[in-house]
Amino acid sequence: VPGHLLDAFLKPASVAVYGASDAPGSFAGRILENLKEGGFPGALVPVNPEHRTAGGLPCVPSLVASGQRVDLAVLAAPARTLPALVRDCAAAGVKGAVVASADGPAAQRQVTPELVAEANRAGLRLLGPGSLGVVRPSAHLNATFSAGQTLPGSLALVSQSGALCTTILDWAAERALGFSLVLAVGDEVDLDLGEVLEGVAVDEQTRGVLLYVEDVRRARSFLSGLKVAARLKPVVVLRAGRYPGPLTPPGPRGADVVFDAALARTGAVRATTVGQLFAAGQLLATGHRVGGSRLAIVTNARGPTMLALDRAVELGITLPPVSEATRAALDAGLPPAGSHLNPVDVQGDAGPERYALAVGACLRDPGFDAVLAMLAPQVPVPPLEMAERLTALARGAPTPLLACLMGGARIRPAREALARAGVPEFRSPELAVEAFGFLARYRLHQAQLLEVPGPLAPGSGPDVARARAVVQTSLGLGLSALPRKPARELLEAFGIPCRSTPTPRGGQGRELHVQVIRDPVFGPAIHFGLGGSPRTGLHETLVALPPLNAVLVRAALVGSSTEAFLREHEGARRAATEA
């Protein structure tokens, strides 16, 4: 989209590097070298009044003094110099600046709100402080101090941690996985996660997004940007700092269950480990989408398949039986021993032909949303030939193919062949199932986004005068909380019916609690779950963000202990959840 605020960071025609020098260990010098090694085609301008050259290029004392026009600047100089450098950028007409100073908190203290406002008035946006920088492989732009170059691809990586970015980039290089862009936001004194996500959403090179979050600094912007991005392409979020500790960023944290509820309302899905984020990245990079949660498994090993089945049950992934046509093809081509249902067991002595027959039959079955091919390195199995067969089957197949090749040295050439062909491959059964689960949950969340809660009382608006009178009367009495009767009057003034709530008797009723709690980050959150006596042993509390309707409430209940309790329980009939 022309004119987006990320253009200066992703499409610069020229880059200035402040602080660049040829001194050994120079932070800015490493950034300049990365830009040169990556083959950046535009002008590179080292800015350093104390050096004549850097990286074989002439240094200028300042951009204003040089009169050169620059789109993007990288500020990798000492923290005490940052205010002057930001003002030099603003005066020279720079549109984007990465504050990559390695001075940590000192840099954050120097880049004050007043300095940010001054830069913004000049049309300059700041990324950082503490930002690793920006990588745009298709433009040969590596404006970071990270070693190595990144392959171009369709996956965006957006992170609050530069260290995690470098970790993921190193992991991706081993698997020949490319990126559309890599951007570390740092301390977000100006450009924040939400604004970055809005830019990523409309980036034509990006088909999937990996997002690492430690704390949400501007909740409204974050949720808005995340919702826009997740509406257009899958977004998988990994959040650290779920529990307080010495490394937890300062400021309000908010409850992790509320963060989960917020993600569900944006359409994004959540990973809980770096391994899961890697797995999601492998699948998102293919651009595959799924229509549901129906998975077929083809395997030559019973034990690992049982692990995959356990994880599928935990994630709500279904394994429906094969169709009659698929069953006929399997019966004709496979030995009678082993399962011809789902999972399909080709047996441990299966060669490439038998294995490929089963995988191909499942890929053609319209009853599946994806096929997982699992392979253990048993004696007769030639892994590389198996990988070549899988690559041929995946090419042009109507259904996504995932591979799980278990083992080490014997399997490595097969893994490399699959990576070159763009077939997502996973080291363990659980990760393969989890990767598919991310796409299945993404589809579910997108469907839930279409649910728009309707008015509680059609045809009538709120009685604001009555509500105001209730509140003013209570305040006049010196009350800090509304008693039951005024509280009911207040709710009824807004069209919320209040029914009597007798204690369930006779063993047939269920008691639930509903509470609205203000989260310090995301605001009002609805907590609900089991009420009454704790004898059930179920203490689960579910959380959702308003507004809600019946469909969204039922979606929050799915798979929960509360849902199980509302079904037939200890002789009591199923609760009337439709009410």
Where are the model-predicted features located?
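Catalytic-core regions of core metabolic enzymes
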Residues: 1-579
